[in-house]
Amino acid sequence: MMKSFLLVVNIVALTLPFLAAEVQNQEQPACCGNDERLFEQKKVLYLLSYPVLNNYLRTAPSYYQNRASVPINNPYLCHLYYVPSFVLWAQGQIPKGPVSTDIHQSTMQYHQAKHPSFMAILSKKILGKATILSTDAIAAPEQTPVSAAQPTVSAGDTPEVSSQFIDTPDTSVLAEEARESPEDTPEISEFINAPDTAVPSEEPRESAEDTPEISSEFIFSPETSTGPAIASMA
């Protein structure tokens, strides 16, 4: 009795899937059109939106890299930070900034990645040329411009003035020479003994009548007279 019951249960379990498939195939032609329309509408709305957005972003003028804003206060999100590789950089080009302190930050942060063009590496030849140009620019002397309004006087333009200034003797020296040698320079002796060219003095001048001896001595001085004239006067 139990054996026959188990056989019937196994047969029914094997035949139930096939019976269910046949029932679905019989009910499908009745609502096939509506299901296909709904499926196509969902497919179009879901699949065409992504290419349209991509095409719009590619054709639109974008001046920065589009990055979605990520909340900082959410502890369950894994933030991706872009770390530049300093392996190819020189030792002087590695940025060494101060350690950031714990300060207040906004709740939204925009993660931006550097474009590869910003990480261009200069060759050694270009760096050498740049340093040479900088040293030449520093070592070049600055020439002061000479204005045309200021005339430049050379020593060769005025030879007469310098010679006259050097050759002009002192009048006191000429007077002493005339007193020592009156025969050689008669004009200078006359200029010295002339009454009109005498230097005026503050004291009152005595006339020749009041002082005959002084006037005779002044006129017939032994420096300007000969020997016979002195003998006759005596």
Curated annotation (Swiss-Prot):
Chain's role: Kappa-casein stabilizes micelle formation, preventing casein precipitation in milk.
Main location: secreted
Modified residues (Phosphothreonine): 158
Signal peptide: 1-21
Gene Ontology cellular component list: extracellular space
Official protein name in the record: Kappa-casein
Residues in Sequence repeats: 127-153, 154-179, 180-207
Cell compartment(s), UniProt: Secreted
Species this protein is from: Cavia porcellus
One biological process term in Gene Ontology: protein stabilization
Segments of this protein annotated with the region Disordered: 143-234
Glycosites: 144, 162
One Pfam assignment: Casein_kappa
Residue stretches of biased makeup (Polar residues): 144-171
Protein family membership: Belongs to the kappa-casein family.
Site location (Cleavage): 118-119
Modification Phosphoserine, positions: 162
Gene giving rise to this polypeptide: CSN3
